[in-house]
Amino acid sequence: LSISLLDEELYGIKRCPQCGIAHPLIRLLGPITFHYVTEQYYPHRAYYYFTGRCSHCGHVILFNGYQNADGNGREQKPEHLQIERSYPDLDSAAEELPEKAQKFLQQALESRHAPDGALMLAASAIDAMLKDKGYRDGTLFARIGKSSEDGVLTEQMAKWAHAIRLSANEPRHADDEFDGATQDDADQILAFTKALGEYLYVLPAKVERWKNKAGDEEDV
């Protein structure tokens, strides 16, 4: 990711790593600090770190990036950097998920700044994962409960699901009125959806890759 640092603002960031809003206005907080020069690459790279604040959510992001070093090793004030990492990192849906679930979860992560939309999309991702495992009938709560009874999910996962709002139509408790999802609602369902995908797809895929690698090494 290449960004431009002009007028104390960051240009070129596609989404805020904190709230997910597209094309955020992020302003620099404090100086751009030189970190080190590495000779691992040619031209040599001068690394910097700096912080910025999203004008939409108000949260702070730490960035680490580099530019080609000049003859003196570095420039005093870089204007263009290649960003290698941000903290927090920009969330993305795991590639091991079924295509439909991956699409819905990615859209949900990118809609964190709009909790109602994030809630709906995350619920759709959960629905897609459950259907992929053969659980097609009933509410999300009912299907998660059935998958727990069958040993597909753990009892703890089922309890977690009942502790959060899975959709606007399935309130957590006995809410008299639903005025819309909160940021906390969105964060909780996103955390659950990512964990569900990790448990059902990502971890089994990692185990399978490890088994295949171990088998290949034994054959050598």
Provide a role label for each language-model segment.
Residues 1-83:
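N-terminal cysteine/histidine-rich coordination modules
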